[in-house]
Structure formats: C-alpha cells, structure tokens
C-alpha cells in the first residue's frame, strides 16, 4: 500500500486523531458483539505505547433527528474500551465539539485516551458528518497536532467529515493496522492472487453485486453463485423458480453476465425448497435446478454443495461474500456450512471473507478461526471487490 501508515510517523507527546469503527450492535445499552472494538485495539495500543495521546472518533447507528440520539451514545463503548485497555477512557456524553470537550482533550497526558461522542450526532443539524461538512472537518482536525490515523475500514467507502474531512486538514493522514491489513488482504487477493483464484458470491440480490460479479469475472478463474440471487439467474435462462425471490428488472443483466462469463460463472444445480418462507410445513431438496410450484428456494441443495466442493479443489485464493441460503435458520444452513468447509480444507489456501452476513455466518457457525481474514467492513469490502477507489483510503498521505 503506497500510503503512510501509523508506523511512519512520530507520535510521542502528540494529540493523535484516530477514526475507528465502533459501530457495534447494542441491546438495552449492552454491546452484543464487540469484534469491532477488539479489531481496533492494536492501533490504539500502539499509539499509547509510543507516548501519543489518542483522540478517537466513531459513529454508531444512524442519527437523523434529535430523537434518534436515544440509545446511540458511545458511553457503553467507552466503558468497554476502558476495560479492554485496562485504563481510563475520557468521554463527555453528548459532546462532539465545544469548550468542555476541548478542555478534556488538552488535559490528556502521554499514553492517555479520549473518545469523542458519536460523530453522527452532527447529522441532526444538516447532516454535517455524512455530507463531509468543510467547517466540521476543519474543527475536528484542529483538536489534534497534525496527525490523523484512519483505522475504520467499515467507513472507508464513505466521504465523511470524520475521515475524509479530517484528512484534508492535517499534515499527515495515515493508515492504522486494521485498515492496512484489510487493504492488503482484499486488494492483493483480487489484484495479484495466487491461482487458482475462486470467488464465491451469495446473498439475495443481483443488484447489490453486479459490479462485483463483472470485476471478478475478469480477475478470478471461477465465480460461484449462491443465495437468493441464484433464482434471478435461473429465470433469465427460463428455469422454473416457483415463488423464489427474483429481481424481474435484472433478468437482462443476469443474461448478459452469463453470456460474458465464458463458463467461469458456476450456478447451483439444485436447491432446498420450502412451501413458505416462515411457517412452512414442508422442506425438501429439488431434483434439479427447477423449483416446484408453490415452493421457494431457501438454500443450495446437496448436489450443489458437492459441485462447489469440486470447483474449490486446489484453490489457492478464495474470496467469499454472501451466504448460500437463509443461514440464520438451521433448516437452511447446510449450503453455507458446506461451502465454508470446502474452502477451509484446501491446503495452503488464502481465504478471505468480505464482511457482512458471511462474516456473521462464519462466526455464528463456528468457522471464523479457520479463515485467513474476515473483513470488518461489508460495504467497503464490496467496493474493493468491485475495483472501486475508496474515498477514505484515497484521502491518506502518499508515502
């Protein structure tokens, strides 16, 4: 990566601004999954060990109006982070700017840390954070000593005041360890993969993945398709899909992708079908591709699992984004489990999960530790897989 990283700058005695991704799920004020906080620890600890004073920025959820602030404070995150670091984390509830926040920042000593309140509280007044308000970016930049560390891969595809805005107003904007690793794993897998390179794409909508499929058809040796979008590809070929999910307005796109694919695009050959999405009374495997009338496909079937297993044999690089079925339901997990197991059993494979539902599936189904890398950013990893330039990354200082 030709951008400066946190190891390229002198941190001792400096107020270092850090964009992290602490957008964690909360239930009744309790964090239900702290992976994103854990993922940011190496960068935060490094800054503190080097004698820097870390000033952390993060968003949490969506905030459009005053009422949305309820339950969106980063206070529980500050407490969790303090426990993980084993030291106090300064935090002023509700403060994204102002004299009290500035005083707390100026009171920091080397090796101490402060968390600024949810950056999206600034969205209540004209979406200042989300629209990268120039004045806000300048103000936040003024709170530090000219160094900004972006370690929030999850928002790297956004142009916000807390990433791009601060970057534009500091002397050096650098990548943290998490951002550096994310880019290294995903970009290298797509741009300079060890071959054979197999991409696996699931999820429900073709519309979400058109750019990704197009880019990966050029880069990968094989592209396997599963999940709900299977049925749009089926219908585009005149295959009966029963009541399965379909994007009627994307049938032509699916047809074009199949024509362009030169045999690289591999579709399932059977499905697990049910007579309803919820409250079903019958679940069965289809004989072939066609889904029965009155039924809908909710997972890939056993023949497809075997076919995908065969397609993955000998793969050296695998990028997976999107589950094969409705994995949250035990009746429709087999496809996702089968594909995960087929990936991780390949000797010497570099296996990457592109965030979002696939990451949740690997974690919930106990396979997370078997993968080389699990991305922390769904949308950002999708855009990297699409070959797009991420604004948060582009804004960093060149080496």
Swiss-Prot record:
GO biological process: one example: gluconeogenesis
Gene3D superfamilies from the UniProt entry: Phosphoglycerate kinase, N-terminal domain (3.40.50.1260)
EC number: 2.7.2.3
Pfam families the record matches: PGK
Main location: cytoplasm
Catalytic activity: (2R)-3-phosphoglycerate + ATP = (2R)-3-phospho-glyceroyl phosphate + ADP
Binding annotation for ATP: 209, 297, 328, 355-358
One GO MF term: phosphoglycerate kinase activity
Keyword ATP-binding: yes
Binding site for substrate: 21-23, 36, 59-62, 120, 158
Coiled coil spans: none
Pathway(s) the chain acts in: Carbohydrate degradation; glycolysis; pyruvate from D-glyceraldehyde 3-phosphate: step 2/5
GO CC aspect terms: cytosol
InterPro entries given in the database record: Phosphoglycerate_kinase, Phosphoglycerate_kinase_CS, Phosphoglycerate_kinase_N, Phosphoglycerate_kinase_sf
Keywords carried by this UniProt record: ATP-binding, Cytoplasm, Glycolysis, Kinase, Nucleotide-binding, Transferase
Keyword Nucleotide-binding among UniProt keywords: yes
Subcellular location: Cytoplasm
Family: Belongs to the phosphoglycerate kinase family.
HAMAP family listed in its UniProt record: Phosphoglyc_kinase (MF_00145)
Subunit: Monomer.
The name this protein goes by in its record: Phosphoglycerate kinase
Organism: Streptococcus suis (strain 05ZYH33)
Name of the coding gene: pgk
């Amino acid at each position: 990566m030709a951008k400066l990283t946190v190891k390229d700058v002198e941190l001792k005695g400096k107020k270092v601004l850090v964009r992290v991704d602490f957008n964690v799920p909360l239930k009744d004020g309790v964090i239900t999954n702290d992976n994103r906080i854990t993922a940011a620890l190496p960068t935060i600890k490094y800054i503190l060990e080097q004698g820097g004073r870390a000033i952390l920025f993060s968003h949490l959820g969506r905030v459009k109006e005053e009422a949305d602030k309820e339950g969106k404070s980063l206070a529980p995150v500050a407490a969790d982070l303090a426990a993980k670091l084993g030291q106090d984390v300064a935090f002023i509830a509700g403060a994204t700017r102002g004299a009290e926040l500035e005083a707390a920042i100026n009171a920091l000593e080397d090796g101490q840390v402060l968390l600024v309140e949810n950056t999206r509280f600034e969205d209540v007044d004209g979406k200042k954070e989300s629209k990268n308000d120039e004045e806000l970016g300048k103000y936040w930049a003024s709170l530090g000593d000219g160094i900004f560390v972006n370690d929030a891969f999850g928002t790297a595809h956004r142009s916000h005041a807390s990433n791009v805005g601060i970057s534009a107003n500091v002397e050096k904007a650098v990548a943290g360890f998490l951002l550096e690793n994310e880019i290294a794993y995903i970009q290298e897998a797509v741009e300079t993969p060890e071959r054979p390179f197999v991409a696996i794409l699931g999820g429900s909508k073709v519309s979400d993945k058109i750019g990704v499929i197009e880019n990966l058809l050029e880069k990968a040796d094989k592209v396997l398709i599963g999940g709900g979008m299977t049925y749009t590809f089926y219908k585009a070929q005149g295959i009966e899909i029963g009541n399965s999910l379909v994007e009627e307005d994307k049938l032509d796109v699916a047809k074009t992708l199949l024509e362009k694919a030169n045999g690289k695009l591999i579709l399932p050959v059977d499905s697990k079908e049910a007579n309803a999405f919820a409250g079903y009374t019958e679940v069965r495997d289809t004989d072939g591709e066609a889904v029965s009338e009155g039924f809908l496909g909710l997972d890939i079937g056993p023949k497809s699992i075997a076919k995908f297993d065969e397609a993955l044999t000998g793969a050296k690089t695998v990028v997976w984004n999107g589950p094969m079925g409705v994995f949250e339901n035990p009746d429709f997990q087999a496809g996702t489990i089968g594909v995960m197991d087929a990936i991780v059993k390949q000797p010497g494979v570099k296996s990457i999960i592109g965030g979002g539902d696939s990451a949740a599936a690997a974690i919930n189904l106990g396979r997370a530790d078997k993968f080389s890398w699990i991305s922390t950013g769904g949308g950002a990893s999708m855009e990297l897989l699409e070959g797009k330039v991420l604004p948060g990354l582009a804004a960093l200082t060149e080496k």
